[in-house]
Amino acid sequence: LGDVYKRQILNNAKMLNIPITVFRTEIFDTVVDITDSPCYLCARMRRGYLYSKARELGCNKIALGHHFDDVIETIVMGMLYGAQIQTMMPKLHSTNFEGMELIRPLYLVREADIIHWAQYNDLHFIQCACRFTEGCASCGGTEKGSKRADVKRLIHKLEQENPYVAKNIFRSVE
């Protein structure tokens, strides 16, 4: 699947006239046998790799694609599965890579708006490229069987009764 994903990413960048360089890592291979919090470990390792590559290229920021819905899902997941109340921040100063920042430019953009924009521009995005997602028998190789997907469905169901649910979750940690 790696080559298929890479081709899709390169095609999107070409359509948007964005110069892109793709780097290969062995992070997925490293975490595949981890049983305790593999997703957390993988995310941390990928972020560290991005910081290192950005610095190598003379950059002082990395931009991640987290959007509004990711933020509220993460808040609820932390509460339900981690017994904690915290949020993603739109901008962070790295504690491990001095002088580096992480930004989330889509922080206030709803996922549905991103999907509509992508469809309008005939762009096709990949799902998580991780082996846990690929091999998920209960979700057919998508993220549909994940805790995040469960929380996404819960929020959607609650929004049907109260259209302010998403904004209220977001504002609850401001």
List where the protein language model places each region.
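An accessory alpha-helical subdomain
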Residues: D150-E174
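Residue-level detector of family-conserved "landmark" positions at structurally sensitive sites
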Residues: V22-F23, L64, Q127-C130, G135, ...
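A short glycine-/small-residue-rich loop at the edge of a beta-strand within enzyme catalytic domains
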Residues: L41, A63, P105, V109, ...
